[in-house]
Amino acid sequence: LEDINTKLKERAGELNIEIDIFQSNSEAEIIEKIQSLTSDFTIINPAAFTHSSVAIRDSLVAKKIRFIEVHLSNVFARESFRKNSFFSDVAVGVISGLGPEGYIAALNYINQSEKISR
């Protein structure tokens, strides 16, 4: 996780993007973080909550935050229950199976998207 965070910070610096990295295994803490966000775009790896948390999904939708869903592993190459996501249909995009590079790809997309929308 530290390596991913370091790479993200480095890339964000190159793109002149301010980022806030947050990780929690607590559904309540994740929801509180989402509710406190001031940006309109985020990257989320919901991990096991992908298949179980309507509450996290609802908080993203209620806050009207555009987001990219990222998974380190290819969830479609794993157990069948992992193919169901409560987030994918409301995400701007989904990146799955690219390992840590998925986060960099998401950050690059956000950078490009924000340039276009200005």
Predicted regions and their residues:
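Short beta->alpha linker loops
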Residues: 25-26, 48, 98
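Short, glycine-/small-residue-rich phosphate/pyrophosphate-handling segment
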Residues: 20-22, 77-118
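CheY-like receiver
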Residues: 33-37, 59, 106
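Short catalytic helix/loop segments, enriched in acidic residues and glycine
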Residues: 1-13
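Mid-chain, well-packed structural core segment of small domains
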Residues: 41-76
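Short, electropositive alpha-helical surface patch
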Residues: 29-47
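Short, hinge-like loop/turn segments at secondary-structure boundaries
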Residues: 37-39, 61-62, 84-89
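Short beta->alpha junction loops
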Residues: 18-28
